[in-house]
Amino acid sequence: MSKIEKKQASASNLLLGAGLNLFETSSLGQPLEVTKVQMAANRTQTMAQAIKAIMSRGGILGFYQGLIPWAWIEASTKGAVLLFTSAELEYWGRRLGLGATSAGAIAGMGGGVAQAYATMGFCTCMKTAEVTRAKQAATGQEVKGTFRVFADLYKEKGIRGINRGVNAVALRQMTNWGSRLALSRFLEKPIRYFTGRTEAEPLTTGQRFVASVSAGALSCWNQPLEVARVEMQSLTKGIQHSSPGIMQTIMSIYKNNGIKGLYRGAVPRMGLGAYQTFVMVFLADCVRGYLAK
Protein backbone atom coordinates (compact mmCIF):
# COMPACT_ATOMS: atom_id res chain seq x y z
CA MET A 1 0.00 0.00 0.00
CA SER A 2 1.43 3.38 -1.04
CA LYS A 3 2.02 6.08 1.55
CA ILE A 4 -0.86 8.52 1.94
CA GLU A 5 0.30 12.07 1.32
CA LYS A 6 -1.62 15.31 1.62
CA LYS A 7 -1.91 17.35 -1.57
CA GLN A 8 -0.11 20.61 -0.94
CA ALA A 9 -1.70 23.90 -2.00
CA SER A 10 1.24 26.28 -2.45
CA ALA A 11 0.86 30.01 -2.99
CA SER A 12 2.02 29.65 -6.61
CA ASN A 13 -0.58 26.97 -7.29
CA LEU A 14 -3.32 29.11 -5.74
CA LEU A 15 -2.28 32.11 -7.85
CA LEU A 16 -2.15 29.94 -10.96
CA GLY A 17 -5.58 28.53 -10.17
CA ALA A 18 -7.03 31.99 -9.65
CA GLY A 19 -5.49 33.23 -12.89
CA LEU A 20 -6.77 30.29 -14.91
CA ASN A 21 -10.22 30.58 -13.33
CA LEU A 22 -10.32 34.25 -14.33
CA PHE A 23 -9.25 33.32 -17.87
CA GLU A 24 -11.87 30.57 -18.09
CA THR A 25 -14.64 32.85 -16.86
CA SER A 26 -13.62 35.79 -19.04
CA SER A 27 -13.38 33.73 -22.23
CA LEU A 28 -15.98 31.03 -22.88
CA GLY A 29 -17.06 30.32 -19.30
CA GLN A 30 -19.35 33.30 -18.74
CA PRO A 31 -21.18 32.95 -22.10
CA LEU A 32 -21.98 29.32 -21.25
CA GLU A 33 -23.02 30.37 -17.72
CA VAL A 34 -25.33 33.10 -19.07
CA THR A 35 -26.86 30.67 -21.60
CA LYS A 36 -27.43 28.11 -18.85
CA VAL A 37 -29.09 30.69 -16.59
CA GLN A 38 -31.22 32.07 -19.45
CA MET A 39 -32.57 28.60 -20.26
CA ALA A 40 -33.12 27.70 -16.61
CA ALA A 41 -34.98 30.96 -15.92
CA ASN A 42 -37.04 30.79 -19.14
CA ARG A 43 -37.87 27.12 -19.34
CA THR A 44 -40.04 27.31 -22.47
CA GLN A 45 -37.18 28.68 -24.59
CA THR A 46 -35.10 26.50 -26.88
CA MET A 47 -31.35 27.03 -26.93
CA ALA A 48 -31.66 29.04 -30.15
CA GLN A 49 -34.33 31.26 -28.58
CA ALA A 50 -32.22 31.68 -25.44
CA ILE A 51 -29.19 32.76 -27.50
CA LYS A 52 -31.36 35.19 -29.49
CA ALA A 53 -32.72 36.68 -26.24
CA ILE A 54 -29.20 37.10 -24.85
CA MET A 55 -28.01 38.75 -28.07
CA SER A 56 -30.90 41.22 -27.84
CA ARG A 57 -29.44 42.51 -24.55
CA GLY A 58 -26.31 44.05 -26.04
CA GLY A 59 -25.07 41.66 -28.71
CA ILE A 60 -21.95 39.73 -27.76
CA LEU A 61 -21.69 41.74 -24.54
CA GLY A 62 -24.99 40.20 -23.47
CA PHE A 63 -23.10 36.95 -22.90
CA TYR A 64 -20.86 38.68 -20.37
CA GLN A 65 -23.49 40.13 -18.04
CA GLY A 66 -22.46 39.63 -14.43
CA LEU A 67 -18.80 39.15 -15.33
CA ILE A 68 -17.58 42.28 -13.53
CA PRO A 69 -17.28 42.19 -10.60
CA TRP A 70 -19.30 39.15 -9.47
CA ALA A 71 -17.91 36.41 -11.73
CA TRP A 72 -14.38 37.72 -11.22
CA ILE A 73 -14.78 37.70 -7.43
CA GLU A 74 -16.09 34.15 -7.56
CA ALA A 75 -13.41 32.93 -9.98
CA SER A 76 -10.52 34.41 -8.00
CA THR A 77 -11.58 32.89 -4.67
CA LYS A 78 -13.52 29.65 -5.17
CA GLY A 79 -10.51 27.64 -6.31
CA ALA A 80 -8.51 28.34 -3.16
CA VAL A 81 -11.45 27.41 -0.94
CA LEU A 82 -11.97 24.13 -2.81
CA LEU A 83 -8.27 23.22 -2.83
CA PHE A 84 -7.72 23.78 0.88
CA THR A 85 -10.93 22.08 2.04
CA SER A 86 -10.89 19.10 -0.31
CA ALA A 87 -7.18 18.39 0.28
CA GLU A 88 -7.70 18.23 4.05
CA LEU A 89 -10.85 16.10 3.85
CA GLU A 90 -9.42 13.66 1.32
CA TYR A 91 -6.22 13.25 3.34
CA TRP A 92 -8.03 12.52 6.60
CA GLY A 93 -10.54 10.30 4.83
CA ARG A 94 -7.71 8.13 3.50
CA ARG A 95 -6.01 8.18 6.91
CA LEU A 96 -9.22 6.81 8.43
CA GLY A 97 -9.20 3.90 5.99
CA LEU A 98 -11.61 5.09 3.30
CA GLY A 99 -11.03 4.12 -0.32
CA ALA A 100 -10.08 6.63 -3.00
CA THR A 101 -13.65 6.91 -4.32
CA SER A 102 -15.24 7.45 -0.89
CA ALA A 103 -12.55 9.88 0.26
CA GLY A 104 -12.87 11.76 -3.02
CA ALA A 105 -16.64 12.02 -2.60
CA ILE A 106 -16.34 13.40 0.94
CA ALA A 107 -13.59 15.81 -0.12
CA GLY A 108 -15.64 17.09 -3.04
CA MET A 109 -18.81 17.46 -0.99
CA GLY A 110 -17.03 19.34 1.79
CA GLY A 111 -15.15 21.55 -0.65
CA GLY A 112 -18.34 22.35 -2.55
CA VAL A 113 -20.22 23.35 0.59
CA ALA A 114 -17.31 25.52 1.72
CA GLN A 115 -17.27 27.25 -1.68
CA ALA A 116 -20.98 28.02 -1.52
CA TYR A 117 -21.05 29.60 1.92
CA ALA A 118 -17.66 31.33 1.71
CA THR A 119 -17.93 33.14 -1.60
CA MET A 120 -20.28 31.65 -4.22
CA GLY A 121 -23.60 32.43 -2.52
CA PHE A 122 -23.76 36.16 -3.11
CA CYS A 123 -21.75 35.92 -6.37
CA THR A 124 -24.18 33.49 -8.03
CA CYS A 125 -27.09 35.52 -6.67
CA MET A 126 -25.78 38.70 -8.27
CA LYS A 127 -24.76 37.00 -11.53
CA THR A 128 -28.27 35.58 -11.89
CA ALA A 129 -29.75 38.96 -11.00
CA GLU A 130 -27.70 40.57 -13.78
CA VAL A 131 -28.91 38.08 -16.40
CA THR A 132 -32.57 38.09 -15.40
CA ARG A 133 -33.02 41.75 -14.47
CA ALA A 134 -31.88 42.95 -17.91
CA LYS A 135 -35.31 41.96 -19.25
CA GLN A 136 -36.87 44.74 -17.17
CA ALA A 137 -35.86 47.26 -19.86
CA ALA A 138 -38.34 45.71 -22.29
CA THR A 139 -41.23 46.24 -19.85
CA GLY A 140 -40.47 49.89 -19.20
CA GLN A 141 -39.13 49.41 -15.70
CA GLU A 142 -36.08 51.26 -14.41
CA VAL A 143 -32.79 49.53 -15.14
CA LYS A 144 -30.55 49.96 -12.09
CA GLY A 145 -26.80 49.57 -11.84
CA THR A 146 -25.42 46.32 -10.47
CA PHE A 147 -24.32 47.86 -7.16
CA ARG A 148 -27.74 49.52 -6.77
CA VAL A 149 -29.36 46.11 -7.15
CA PHE A 150 -26.91 44.71 -4.58
CA ALA A 151 -27.78 47.55 -2.18
CA ASP A 152 -31.53 47.03 -2.68
CA LEU A 153 -31.26 43.30 -2.00
CA TYR A 154 -29.19 43.98 1.11
CA LYS A 155 -31.60 46.68 2.29
CA GLU A 156 -34.57 44.35 1.79
CA LYS A 157 -33.30 41.34 3.76
CA GLY A 158 -29.72 41.99 4.81
CA ILE A 159 -27.20 39.17 4.36
CA ARG A 160 -30.02 36.78 3.48
CA GLY A 161 -31.08 39.07 0.66
CA ILE A 162 -27.76 38.89 -1.16
CA ASN A 163 -27.44 35.17 -0.43
CA ARG A 164 -30.82 34.08 -1.76
CA GLY A 165 -30.63 30.49 -2.93
CA VAL A 166 -27.33 29.86 -1.13
CA ASN A 167 -28.61 26.54 0.26
CA ALA A 168 -29.40 25.41 -3.28
CA VAL A 169 -25.90 26.52 -4.32
CA ALA A 170 -24.44 24.51 -1.43
CA LEU A 171 -26.41 21.39 -2.37
CA ARG A 172 -25.46 21.80 -6.02
CA GLN A 173 -21.78 22.26 -5.22
CA MET A 174 -21.81 19.42 -2.69
CA THR A 175 -23.38 16.93 -5.11
CA ASN A 176 -21.49 18.31 -8.11
CA TRP A 177 -17.99 18.14 -6.65
CA GLY A 178 -18.77 15.02 -4.64
CA SER A 179 -19.84 13.28 -7.84
CA ARG A 180 -17.03 14.76 -9.93
CA LEU A 181 -14.18 13.80 -7.59
CA ALA A 182 -15.67 10.39 -6.74
CA LEU A 183 -16.36 9.56 -10.40
CA SER A 184 -12.92 10.82 -11.42
CA ARG A 185 -11.28 8.47 -8.91
CA PHE A 186 -13.61 5.64 -9.96
CA LEU A 187 -12.96 6.14 -13.69
CA GLU A 188 -9.22 6.13 -13.10
CA LYS A 189 -9.44 2.42 -12.22
CA PRO A 190 -10.53 1.14 -15.67
CA ILE A 191 -8.06 3.55 -17.29
CA ARG A 192 -5.24 2.07 -15.22
CA TYR A 193 -6.48 -1.45 -16.01
CA PHE A 194 -6.55 -0.95 -19.79
CA THR A 195 -3.25 0.99 -19.89
CA GLY A 196 -1.40 -1.29 -17.49
CA ARG A 197 -0.55 1.47 -15.01
CA THR A 198 -0.19 0.64 -11.32
CA GLU A 199 -1.61 2.69 -8.44
CA ALA A 200 1.82 4.18 -7.83
CA GLU A 201 2.17 5.46 -11.41
CA PRO A 202 0.55 8.83 -12.18
CA LEU A 203 -1.86 9.06 -15.09
CA THR A 204 -0.93 11.12 -18.12
CA THR A 205 -2.54 14.51 -18.72
CA GLY A 206 -4.74 13.03 -21.46
CA GLN A 207 -5.89 10.17 -19.24
CA ARG A 208 -6.75 12.52 -16.39
CA PHE A 209 -8.56 14.77 -18.87
CA VAL A 210 -10.74 11.87 -20.06
CA ALA A 211 -11.58 10.88 -16.48
CA SER A 212 -12.34 14.46 -15.43
CA VAL A 213 -14.47 15.38 -18.46
CA SER A 214 -16.45 12.14 -18.19
CA ALA A 215 -17.00 12.74 -14.48
CA GLY A 216 -18.01 16.35 -15.13
CA ALA A 217 -20.61 15.34 -17.72
CA LEU A 218 -22.04 12.60 -15.51
CA SER A 219 -22.23 15.03 -12.58
CA CYS A 220 -24.96 17.03 -14.33
CA TRP A 221 -27.56 14.62 -12.91
CA ASN A 222 -28.18 17.28 -10.23
CA GLN A 223 -29.41 19.87 -12.76
CA PRO A 224 -32.78 20.21 -10.89
CA LEU A 225 -30.85 21.85 -8.04
CA GLU A 226 -29.28 24.30 -10.49
CA VAL A 227 -32.65 25.16 -12.06
CA ALA A 228 -34.12 25.66 -8.58
CA ARG A 229 -31.16 27.85 -7.65
CA VAL A 230 -31.72 30.05 -10.71
CA GLU A 231 -35.44 30.31 -9.97
CA MET A 232 -34.77 31.33 -6.36
CA GLN A 233 -32.25 34.00 -7.40
CA SER A 234 -34.05 35.29 -10.50
CA LEU A 235 -35.19 38.92 -10.66
CA THR A 236 -37.50 38.35 -13.63
CA LYS A 237 -40.44 39.43 -11.46
CA GLY A 238 -38.47 41.97 -9.46
CA ILE A 239 -37.26 41.56 -5.89
CA GLN A 240 -39.45 38.92 -4.28
CA HIS A 241 -40.51 39.41 -0.67
CA SER A 242 -41.12 35.69 -0.11
CA SER A 243 -38.34 33.10 -0.13
CA PRO A 244 -39.64 29.61 -0.99
CA GLY A 245 -37.47 26.67 -0.01
CA ILE A 246 -35.59 24.35 -2.36
CA MET A 247 -38.17 21.54 -2.42
CA GLN A 248 -41.05 23.99 -2.77
CA THR A 249 -39.29 25.60 -5.74
CA ILE A 250 -38.54 22.24 -7.38
CA MET A 251 -42.14 21.09 -6.98
CA SER A 252 -43.41 24.36 -8.46
CA ILE A 253 -41.13 24.00 -11.49
CA TYR A 254 -42.19 20.37 -11.96
CA LYS A 255 -45.86 21.33 -11.73
CA ASN A 256 -45.51 24.07 -14.35
CA ASN A 257 -42.88 22.63 -16.70
CA GLY A 258 -42.67 18.91 -16.00
CA ILE A 259 -39.50 16.86 -15.68
CA LYS A 260 -37.97 18.58 -18.73
CA GLY A 261 -38.21 21.92 -16.95
CA LEU A 262 -35.94 20.62 -14.20
CA TYR A 263 -33.21 19.84 -16.73
CA ARG A 264 -33.28 23.06 -18.74
CA GLY A 265 -29.77 24.35 -19.36
CA ALA A 266 -28.13 20.95 -18.87
CA VAL A 267 -26.41 21.04 -22.29
CA PRO A 268 -24.58 24.38 -21.82
CA ARG A 269 -23.74 23.28 -18.28
CA MET A 270 -22.09 20.12 -19.64
CA GLY A 271 -20.19 22.28 -22.12
CA LEU A 272 -19.13 24.57 -19.27
CA GLY A 273 -17.85 21.60 -17.27
CA ALA A 274 -15.84 20.33 -20.24
CA TYR A 275 -14.34 23.76 -20.90
CA GLN A 276 -13.45 24.27 -17.23
CA THR A 277 -11.71 20.90 -17.23
CA PHE A 278 -9.80 21.79 -20.42
CA VAL A 279 -8.54 25.03 -18.87
CA MET A 280 -7.78 23.67 -15.41
CA VAL A 281 -6.16 20.41 -16.64
CA PHE A 282 -4.48 21.02 -19.99
CA LEU A 283 -3.67 24.73 -19.71
CA ALA A 284 -2.61 24.35 -16.07
CA ASP A 285 -0.13 21.62 -16.98
CA CYS A 286 1.18 23.66 -19.93
CA VAL A 287 1.74 26.73 -17.73
CA ARG A 288 3.40 24.67 -14.98
CA GLY A 289 5.69 23.07 -17.57
CA TYR A 290 6.62 26.45 -19.01
CA LEU A 291 7.34 27.96 -15.58
CA ALA A 292 9.43 24.94 -14.59
CA LYS A 293 11.86 25.52 -17.47
UniProtKB/Swiss-Prot annotation:
One biological process term from GO is: mitochondrial citrate transmembrane transport
Output the Gene3D superfamilies linked to this UniProt entry: Mitochondrial carrier domain
Keywords tagged on the record: Membrane, Mitochondrion, Mitochondrion inner membrane, Repeat, Transmembrane, Transmembrane helix, Transport
One GO cellular component from the entry? mitochondrion
Its subcellular locations are: Mitochondrion inner membrane
Any single GO molecular-function term of the entry would be: tricarboxylate secondary active transmembrane transporter activity
Pfam families found in the cross-reference section: Mito_carr
Q: Does the keyword Repeat apply?
A: yes
* The name this protein goes by in its record: Uncharacterized mitochondrial carrier C83.13
Similarity annotation: Belongs to the mitochondrial carrier (TC 2.A.29) family.
- Tell me how this protein sits in the membrane: Multi-pass membrane protein
TM ranges are: 15-35, 53-73, 96-114, 169-189, 208-228, 262-283
